[in-house]
Amino acid sequence: MKTKNIFFSSLFLIAAYSCSLENETYDQLGSDNVMTTENDVKAAVTGIYHELRGGGWDRYNCAWGSLLTMQIGCTDECDCNWVWDKQLDFLWTAETTDLGQFYTGLVPAVTKATSLLERMRKISISAPIKRRYMAEVRCLRAMWAYDLYDLYGTVPLITDPDIALDPQKAQSYMPERPSIEWYVNFIDTELKEAEENLKPASLLAASEYGRMTKGIAQMYMLKLYMHEAGQERHYRNDEGKAMMWWNRVDSITEVMIKDGEYSLQKDYMSIWSPSNQRNSEVIFPIPNFPEGGLGNCFLAHALPADYVSQNGIALTKWGGFLVPWDFYDTYDPKDKRRNALLATYWNGKKMVDRRTEYTGKPGAVPMKYQENPSTTGQWDASEYVINRYAEVILARAEALNEIYGPTQEAKDLVHEIRERAFDNYKGSKYEKEINDITDKDAFRAHLLKERGWEFCWEGMRRPDLIRHGELISIARGKLMAEPKHILYAIPQSVIYENPNLKNNEGF
């Protein structure tokens, strides 16, 4: 099978390869696709990155059903002008299609990764190159396994190459759900072993930007450890195990900070600025291009229909995404992070006040992603920022507080984040209110608020609330919210196909 387009319909590492080459399409790993050379392996690994993007809308993009909206759509920082009430109001079922797309897209992606890894093992190429590319695929596979776990709980994954490479075995493979112990150990082991052979971000060639790095593997270890700490405390009632995981958070964040690979940007909004792409705060980026299926479409989802660019950029505006005023109003008026949420905008004639003059659903416009001159229709070239260094800093502060209480180091880490949010921070009341906290519970409660202000509309809110045991009590106060809603339902179509697979409790 041949193609004259090495993008594989979704490849974002365009600069790495010539679009004039004719290569095998390794995003379809059938028996006819044989890899024999280093270039074959490189193309095949690049092809597996397609699974991050899907069709350009869901998965690690921003449309409904993406990881982003799955992680905020049932929380207090999110609202929408469109009819997505099943998620917004905790009314989802196993038949809610949008909330099952991540599952039905990424579980097969894990199988593809397993197939590719086995084929790569059998190829005779340079050992360091082989280890590096296999590490990339293992990191991707572990990342997908973690995000599926966070959303749906443990799910059956094909990690056995004998099954993955045999269509008949794969078709008849109907396992029960794996244990939490097996699943967590699988993710942790894959990430640790991948990390050993991944490049630091600073050593990537410009054409390699967007590939898996040592920092991304560490970031997902951090996410896994924080997830397990929260689960053990609030849902498994094992404080001893929770503390074990907090110690792992302590260790991995210490390593990441001492490595010096990443640093905070001085200006908060510059993190997402089109003129500051590939900056040192971004750990996990997805590069974009102003083309269908390859671009960033966040602004199209967020901008009101009558919004007019003051930069003369032709923008698509669907007016969906919102930040409820109740959440917006938790920001201090002098907190510069609030500037990422538009309360007023230009409609070509005047500034519109969304509180008093907007007739749609009430709320501010999330606009961390900014107007980009490189825009075609709804697609622009701003990279997606999936994870960034500020998460590491606040995660370390949280771990230190859980282990030792609100130490000075923990407070100093919070100061690092707040110093760029407030002018003249040193000696201000904003610095003092952190220094005055002496109680572990009070510091924990503040960290949850701080993360809300720092990461609004970045996909952190749902896991943060769950880790603190507060999703159901805080998130929107919806009447239909129940304890079962800390997980989404496995799609009913998957349950029909595998009679041994039991859905999450309550679905």
Segments and roles (model prediction):
Residues 1-27:
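Bacterial Sec-dependent N-terminal signal peptides
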Residues 18-21, 96, 106-109, 180-182, ...:
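Long, intrinsically disordered, low-complexity segments
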Residues 19-66, 92, 243-246, 253, ...:
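Membrane-proximal, proline-rich intrinsically disordered regions
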Residues 32, 59-77, 158-161, 199-216, ...:
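Short, surface-exposed recognition loops and adjoining beta-strand edges that mediate ligand/DNA contacts
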Residues 38, 42, 46, 50-51, ...:
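Conserved, well-structured interaction surfaces
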Residues 88, 326-389:
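Flexible, polar/acidic helix-loop-strand segments at domain edges
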